Structures are given as structure tokens and as C-alpha cells.
Amino acid sequence: MAYQLYRNTTLGNSLQESLDELIQTQQITPQLALQVLLQFDKAINTALASRVRNRVNFRGSLNTYRFCDNVWTFVLNDVEFREVTDLVKVDKVKIVACDGKSESTQNKSDK
């Protein structure tokens, strides 16, 4: 099962809006829209894992953290993101981190 975190991105929201419009005009079924979203979840996770190679450093003050259901959530204040020549400052950032390994990979490594 792929994580659904990226459905709430600009790309994911645009896809959902387009699918909703197609459902309303009866051009596709809700079941097909769900299949498209599931495929999007798999594809975006695979693409980000294999194609993104840029490195960004960030520093901030940890406000809160939580670990629940194998998911880490961090809230940082006064954060600076640095990439080679760029610097971006933001007041607040929420980071959600999930285990990138599939269950089958974890089970093999646990043995």
C-alpha cells in the first residue's frame, strides 16, 4: 500500500478536482476515479524515491513531535531552508515522515 500523503499537494488536488468533474459529468465512474488515485499514490511515491536527487538543509526550533502508527510528525518554528545558493525562511513547518520501506522489505530484513 502506498501512502496517500501527496494527494494534498497542488498536483494531487488538481487531479482530485479533475476526477470529481469527470464523475459529475458522468464521463467516469467513482470506482475508476479511485483506481486513478491509487495509481497516483504508487507513481508519486516511486517517482520521488527514484528521481529526486537534490539536497536541501534546514534548521529550525522544534515545537512538537509525535510518533504514532509508524509515522513521525514534527512541527518546527522559525525554519531556514538552504539549497546551494538559495535561502528561504518560514515561520512554521509541519513535517510528516513515514517509513519508505514496503512491508515485504521490512519482513525480509527482520528475519
UniProtKB/Swiss-Prot annotation:
An example Gene Ontology CC term for this record: transcription factor TFIIA complex
InterPro entries given in the database record: TFIIA_a-hlx, TFIIA_b-brl, TFIIA_gsu, TFIIA_gsu_C, TFIIA_gsu_N
Pfam families (alphabetical): TFIIA_gamma_C, TFIIA_gamma_N
Chief place where the protein resides: nucleus
Keyword vocabulary terms for this entry: Nucleus, Transcription, Transcription regulation
Gene Ontology terms describing biological process: transcription initiation at RNA polymerase II promoter
Gene3D superfamilies noted in UniProt: Transcription factor IIA (TFIIA), beta-barrel domain, Transcription factor IIA gamma subunit, alpha-helical domain
UniProt cross-references to CDD domains, sorted A to Z: TFIIA_gamma_C (cd10014), TFIIA_gamma_N (cd10145)
Location in or out of the cell: Nucleus
PANTHER family: TRANSCRIPTION INITIATION FACTOR IIA SUBUNIT 2
Membership in a protein family: Belongs to the TFIIA subunit 2 family.
Oligomeric form and interacting partners: TFIIA is a heterodimer of the large unprocessed subunit 1 and a small subunit gamma. It was originally believed to be a heterotrimer of an alpha, a beta and a gamma subunit. Interacts with NCOA6 general coactivator. TFIIA forms a complex with TBP.
Known role: TFIIA is a component of the transcription machinery of RNA polymerase II and plays an important role in transcriptional activation. TFIIA in a complex with TBP mediates transcriptional activity.
Protein name (Swiss-Prot/TrEMBL): Transcription initiation factor IIA subunit 2
